[in-house]
Curated annotation (Swiss-Prot):
SMART domains recorded: DnaJ
Designated name of the protein: Curved DNA-binding protein
Keywords: Chaperone, Cytoplasm, DNA-binding
Principal localisation: cytoplasm
Any Pfam family hit: DnaJ
Compartment(s): Cytoplasm, Nucleoid
Gene coding for it: cbpA
Domain J: 5-69
Gene3D superfamilies the UniProt entry points to: DnaJ domain, Single helix bin, Urease metallochaperone UreE, N-terminal domain
GO BP of this protein: chaperone cofactor-dependent protein refolding; protein refolding
Species the sequence originates in: Escherichia coli O139:H28 (strain E24377A / ETEC)
Disulfide linkage: none
Length: 306
């Protein structure tokens, strides 16, 4: 195996401390990350930097590497390498020395199968009105960079322009293939999953594919019937309140709910009778006339009965 100059790869000196080397690693990992860099050899450079960091970040591996680098031009280097404790290794053990020092990036790396990158999930808030049509959205997320030990070393900001299809529902997952973390040893990238969260609406509640809206009406509108303007997701409509309507009554407006590929829901107007403010003398007299005319009506007649 070729003995690479890891210090040159990292752009540091052999005398630099771990903090300096770590700073260089983060800078280069960000620069050559395949999802960020436009350079044609970015992936190869990224793996080379990761390989150098794996060795130089470990005190024992770095010491062994330094000793091997010091003897790299020794004619005996290919036949015998003297470890710090005096133990000798012949050419048969040479590959094992490299494997013990360089870990995943030496002999073992040739034996490891390709591994798929990690998937990433992010939540995307969508307004109810936006579910009616396909729309574009710019999303930003952090792409984790894993070190040789499977730990997150840093996170690289990434921005994508995506299309949110019409008819998305709360909790729906949208897959963006290959936008997760990079694979290992030629494996495919992971995916990015957008998890849709329908933002709460000040007027509408979601019930499956249907919508509910509370419609305030006056006592006389409920009693006599009326036509009132009610908003929907697209436009306002004129809703007919039947005479004798009750509080809590649900009036169905067909086809004004949520839209999906399979079906279109309905809008349900839930009536809420709102009393006027404290009446003046004239208004109180009118209420009294109504009470006298309906003296036989007892709203609590069947109260508590099954």
């Amino acid at each position: 195996m070729e003995l690479k100059d890891y210090y040159a790869i990292m752009g540091v000196k052999p005398t630099d401390d771990l903090k300096t080397i770590k700073t260089a690693y983060r800078r280069l990992a960000r620069k050559y990350h395949p999802d960020v860099s436009k350079e044609p050899d970015a992936e190869a450079r990224f793996k080379e930097v990761a390989e150098a960091w794996e060795v130089l970040s470990d005190e024992q591996r770095r010491a062994e590497y330094d000793q091997m680098w010091q003897h790299r031009n020794d004619p005996q280097f290919n036949r015998q390498f003297h470890h710090g404790d005096g133990q000798s290794f012949n050419a048969e053990d040479f590959d094992d020395i490299f494997s013990s020092i360089f870990g995943q990036h030496a002999r073992q790396s040739r034996q490891r199968p390709a591994a798929r990158g990690h998937d990433i999930e992010i939540e995307v808030a969508v307004f109810l009105e936006e579910t009616l049509t396909e729309h574009k959205r710019t999303i930003s997320y952090n792409l984790p960079v894993y070190n040789a030990f499977g730990m997150i070393e840093q996170e690289i900001p990434k921005t994508l322009n995506v299309k949110i299809p019409a008819g998305v529902g709360n909790g729906q997952r949208i897959r963006l293939k290959g936008q997760g973390t990079p694979g290992e040893n030629g494996g495919p990238n992971g995916d990015l999953w957008l998890v849709i969260h329908i933002a709460p609406h000040p007027l509408f509640d979601i019930v499956g594919q249907d919508l509910e809206i509370v419609v305030p009406v006056s006592p006389w509108e409920a009693a006599l019937g009326a036509k009132v303007t009610v908003p929907t997701l697209k436009e306002s409509i004129l809703l007919t309140i039947p005479p004798g309507s009750q509080a809590g009554q649900r009036l169905r407006v067909k086809g004004k709910g949520l839209v999906s590929k399979k079906q279109t829901g309905d809008l349900y107007a839930v009536l809420k009778i709102v009393m006027p403010p404290k009446p003046d003398e004239n208004t109180a007299a009118l209420w009294q006339q109504l009470a006298d005319a309906q003296s036989s009506f007892d709203p609590r007649k069947d109260w508590g009965k099954a």
